[in-house]
UniProtKB/Swiss-Prot annotation:
CDD domains: MPN_DUF2466. The keyword Hydrolase applies. The lineage of its organism: Bacteria, Bacillati, Bacillota, Clostridia, Eubacteriales. Residues 105-227 form the MPN domain. It holds the Pfam family RadC. A motif (JAMM motif) lies at residues 176-189. Belongs to the UPF0758 family. It comes from Clostridium perfringens (strain ATCC 13124 / DSM 756 / JCM 1290 / NCIMB 6125 / NCTC 8237 / Type A). GO terms for molecular function: metal ion binding; metallopeptidase activity. This is UPF0758 protein CPF_2399. It comes from the Bacteria. PANTHER family: DNA REPAIR PROTEIN RADC (PTHR30471), UPF0758 PROTEIN YEES-RELATED (PTHR30471:SF3). InterPro entries: MPN, RadC_JAB, RuvA_2-like, UPF0758, UPF0758_CS, UPF0758_N. Keywords: Hydrolase, Metal-binding, Metalloprotease, Protease, Zinc.
């Protein structure tokens, strides 16, 4: 799309809002959907071009939902108003996902993988996620606990069980990713799991599983009889 074309010069059938009403939202690109939310561009770009620049500057949709106001405003053409529009949209989506979690019951490792695989598999650094469960193995919450190089000296059970107690969890599952794409457990992974299992016994909050996420695959330490 030429930068000389303004949004009102685009044929009406190709404008994002009109396309959504005629074809349905599922037929629009990510950039077109964001353009509808932002509504206007600026003197240099129409709103579709601006949306393209935003999404690609922050690393795609995954980056968009994790971007801060400061990071968004570093994109040319994005001021405070548009940054807050994007942040509000992202927060609404996150709240919807939290409400959706309440309907999820965990009965096998693949149920857990569905909750975290897409979120963790493409990250460039290790992230540890805690899933708190009630007495019927329904998900209470899903929380990011730690980010960075995971090892047994840095991941302290106190941080994990503090969140479990706060949410009145009956049991927990932890998940973390291997940026290499290989989910084979390391010695540190096994040590962390052992420590958490013992702490859980003392606190009456059972560690049900530890999933390691690789590139579109995962390993359950429970299934491997490590837990």
């Amino acid at each position: 799309m030429s930068k000389n074309i303004r949004i009102n010069e685009i044929p009406s059938g190709e404008r994002p809002r009109e396309k959504l009403l005629f074809y349905g939202a599922q037929f629009l690109s990510n950039e077109e959907l964001l353009a509808i939310i932002l509504r206007t561009g600026n003197k240099d770009s129409n709103v579709v071009e601006l949306s393209y620049r935003i999404i690609h500057s922050v690393g795609g949709l995954n980056g968009l939902f994790k971007a801060s106001a400061k990071e968004l405003m570093e994109v040319k053409g994005v001021k405070e108003a548009k940054a807050t529009q994007i942040l509000a949209m992202c927060e609404l989506y996150k709240r919807f996902k939290v409400s959706e979690l309440a309907q999820v019951k965990i009965s096998k490792p693949s149920d857990v993988a569905k909750l975290v695989l897409d979120e963790l598999r493409m990250l460039r650094q290790e992230v540890l996620i805690l899933i708190n469960l009630d007495t019927k193995n329904k998900v209470i919450s899903k929380k990011e606990i730690f980010k960075g190089g995971l090892n047994s000296s840095l991941v302290h059970p106190r941080e994990i069980f503090r969140e479990a107690v706060k949410d009145s969890a009956a049991s927990i599952i932890i998940c973390h990713n291997h940026p290499s794409g290989d989910p084979t457990p390391s010695r540190d992974d096994i040590n962390i799991t052992t420590r958490l299992k013992e702490c859980g016994k003392m606190m009456g909050i059972e560690l049900l599983d530890h999933l390691i996420i690789g590139d579109n695959r995962f390993i359950s330490l429970k299934e491997k009889d490590i837990l």
